[in-house]
A protein has these predicted regions:
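Short, conserved catalytic/metal-binding motifs centered on acidic residues
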Residues: 10-11, 25, 43, 47, ...
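Short, charged amphipathic recognition helices of the HTH superfamily
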Residues: 17-30
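Short, basic interhelical loop/turn and adjoining N-cap
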Residues: 30-49
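Alpha-helix capping and helix-loop boundary segments enriched in small/acidic/polar residues
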Residues: 38, 131-142, 162-169
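Active-site-proximal, Lys/Arg-enriched surface segment
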Residues: 48-118
Length: 174
């Protein structure tokens, strides 16, 4: 179980530096900050096998751990006000990956894609949360739920949270 927790910590570190390929986890192998937290970064192939076993429950566990890490970072910062930016991005795929579909894809018109929705804290330059959606998903879909989840996980009496989104997120629910 310690190995699996180490893989999760490795993935969180990858999220925080914005990796786009598991191969880039190697950039963390000799990082002093990663070593300070006693995280042994495994080979990308090992992490890939680990991720292949994920289901909804383990994905939710990963999200919960990420919120705990972000909350610790936020607490250490002693900020009393933060801005959370919510946005989406299209990830082009080749072939017929599960969940990918044709949608708004400016990179390759007509190709199947995923539509990733994510939230970052502007002041800390840190990833807060996010999830993968089908390529044909409307920009604002899931944003209200994401805002509720963020507030439920990080809100405190001495913290003011401002959410910032572009006009694609205009929706009565938000």
């Amino acid at each position: 179980n310690k190995i699996k927790m180490n893989h999760i910590k490795t993935m969180l570190c990858g999220h925080f530096i914005g990796i786009d390929k598991l191969e880039r986890l190697k950039l963390l192998q000799n990082d002093p900050l990663v070593n300070e937290f006693d995280i042994s970064v495994k080979e990308p192939e090992t992490v890939s096998r680990f991720l292949g076993n994920f289901n909804f429950k383990t994905t939710q566990m990963f999200r919960d751990i990420n919120f705990k890490v972000f909350k610790k970072l936020l607490t250490k910062s002693k900020l009393t006000s933060i801005t959370i930016d919510i946005d989406s991005s299209v990830i082009n795929v080749e072939g017929h990956q599960e969940g990918a579909s044709k949608g708004y894809n400016p990179k390759k018109l007509g190709n199947r894609c995923y539509n990733i929705q994510f939230a970052f804290c502007d002041e800390l330059k840190a990833y807060v949360t996010g999830f993968v959606r089908s390529g044909n998903t409307y920009t604002a879909n899931g944003a209200a739920e994401m805002i509720k989840e963020i507030v439920a996980n990080i809100k405190s009496d001495d913290l003011e949270i401002l959410f910032r989104m572009d006009s694609g997120y205009f929706d009565e629910k938000i």
